[in-house]
Amino acid sequence: MSRTVKAPRGTQLSCKNWQTEAPMRMLMNNLDPEVARDPANLIVYGGTGRAARNWECFDKIVETLKNLEMDETLLVQSGKPVAVFKTNEWAPRVLIANSNLVPKWANWEYFRELEARGLIMYGQMTAGSWIYIGTQGILQGTYETFYAVAKKYFNGTLKGKWVLTAGLGEMGGAQPLAVTLNDGIVLAVEIDKKMIDRRIKTGYLDVWTNNLDEALEMVQNAVKEGKPLSVGLLANAADVHPELVKRGIIPDIVTDQTAAHDPLTGYVPRGMSFDDALNLRKENPKKYLELVYESVVRHIEAILEMQKQGAKVFEYGNNIRRLAYDHGVKDAFNIPGYVPEYIRDLFSEGKGPFRWAALSGNPEDIYKTDKKVLELFPYDEHLKKWVELAQKKVKWQGLPARICWLGQGERAEFGLAINKMVKDGELEAPIVIGRDHHDTGSVASPYRETEAMKDGSDAIADWPILNAMLNVASGATWVSFHHGGGVGIGYSLHAGMVTVADGTELAHKKLERVLTNDVGLGVVRHADAGYEIAINTAKKHNIQMPMLDT
């Protein structure tokens, strides 16, 4: 049974308090048709990343939240509400564990056996932790990545440069706008027409075509004129990329955001229509995967050839290199990952995808907080540019929300300012403050966030576990711990938190601790690995690290 879900707006409560109303509204917001990729099947984004295991579980979660007291905690096991325990008002109202498996059994094949038996759910990162805010949630990170590429190779701008990528799903859909915000041109290959239509509708993609020659003509004209342009091409990357190599057409930058982390549901083989692929996936998944692997090999071999001919290439965290490597492309890892290449220094400062959403549903609440963040950090010209661009270019999906990459000290200062705005009646209703799991200290993912760590600690998973426990101890409203987000089952462990700014003194105390400690652990994680930026940041903010100077 499916239905249309939208979070309530305004100040009338369905639950007993804002600390339980907030997770209920954000769960519902994850399944808003404006937000979710496939809401009828509870799929939010990222292949099969779900908000709840099934509709019965969804209904029970909502019912339980409506009756939950301020000293009780709901436990959610892979999208299923399993228990309520008496705790205390400082404890989280919800604790979530999604997709976690003992390491020896942590592979897609076994996961799918358990999923078919109704025992587990794939939560991705923010799908099962109820803090997905639509494509904007990844937009600034994508913008920052392409800005870093421009700064490193192209004198700080992508003007007159073009990017080749593939995948316009809920994550990859941020790429076209992120490139054009950096004044560049992008050709984005996508096999699913619905995804192209969605990006056009939300303003992330300028134009589309199903003809390669027409697409290239538009791209080349924009390059000559130095005008930003995003072009969607309805086609398969495993066909398009080798064809470009054959023609000697080499982009300036090449990356990829197909959902290759889940090859069965996230990647479509070449040489067949999208509908035929869906039928084959259902009728003969083994044959389907064989064709996927062959296509991925062609796809990555073409990118490697473009790299040899001068293109700046990087993997955008979907684990496609590993998939290609496992099927014969032994130089797949000559393609660098985007985190060590472009994001690690930001993580070392404690910067990452901090986000907030207006529970009122009133966009004015977000515009007022936009103004506040610029007042608090007037020295940050890059932040100012981002907020101004977001206000002009980003369309709301579901509850109005904003993302800004803020660092150690900044997150707590801003969170407390928001809480005061709620207290003083400047905002219509409370604000939820959270982040992506893809953050400075909350992930162990050797092919993405923790790839090529300075001390070789890529696969150490103690840090996200410490992050989750620290957020519980600090007073977050809900805390989650997941497996397999971004890069797929077997390749990552990660934690998330959300805290509600409801204007109370208790919220003030919780926000101060959570927003200091959560990001502080990220600084510690990078300082412990030997990154000078992180060491200096830890000292600047007086973070106690007993062995820092030993």
Swiss-Prot record:
Pathway: Amino-acid degradation; L-histidine degradation into L-glutamate; N-formimidoyl-L-glutamate from L-histidine: step 2/3. Its EC number is 4.2.1.49. GO terms for molecular function: urocanate hydratase activity. PROSITE patterns: UROCANASE (PS01233). It comes from the Bacteria. It catalyses: 4-imidazolone-5-propanoate = trans-urocanate + H2O. One of its GO terms (cellular component) is cytoplasm. NAD(+) binds at residues 46-47, 124, 190, 236-237, 257-261, 267-268, 316, 486. Its cofactor is NAD(+). SUPFAM superfamilies: Urocanase (SSF111326). One of its GO terms (biological process) is L-histidine catabolic process to glutamate and formate. The active site is at 404. Binds 1 NAD(+) per subunit. Keywords: Cytoplasm, Histidine metabolism, Lyase, NAD. It is found in: Cytoplasm. InterPro entries: Urocanase, Urocanase-like, Urocanase_C, Urocanase_central_sf, Urocanase_CS, Urocanase_N, Urocanase_Rossmann-like, Urocanase_sf. PANTHER family: UROCANATE HYDRATASE. Catalyzes the conversion of urocanate to 4-imidazolone-5-propionate. Belongs to the urocanase family. This is Urocanate hydratase. It comes from Thermosipho melanesiensis (strain DSM 12029 / CIP 104789 / BI429). The gene is hutU.
